[in-house]
Amino acid sequence: GLTEHQEGKVSRYLLKTRTDNPTWSDERVLAKVTRYRNAEIRVRSKVIARTEIAYAAGNGKTAMWNQLAKDGLIDPNVMDKEWLGIADNRQCGVCDELNGSVVPFDKSFTASGATFMQEPAHPNCRCVTTVITRKKKT
């Protein structure tokens, strides 16, 4: 279904369509608003699909890292995870806060009071996490 915000957009579109077209029949108004609502549903569907793909990729990557550690192919005692955002004008505050964060291999990232083992931090998140070798303290 649609988010509360999207339902509000559809309601406002209905009111505007009725106001702007007082001579239209109810059927014509309904047809126009239905097309608009269906377009919003397509947008919502794409957001859900992108986010679920990001969750699946993040979970798969984490499972792979854990298996590599279990098999002794990487040493989690010298590995960290790094959160990598897309530092542009579309990056949200949470992702901006997480960008460049480094945590121990088996720990969570924290931003704005929430914790994340890996991406995504929210719907449509474009961030990724990667495993890095822990930097030696000098």
Model features per residue range: what roles?
Residues 1-124, 130-138:
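Domain-core detector
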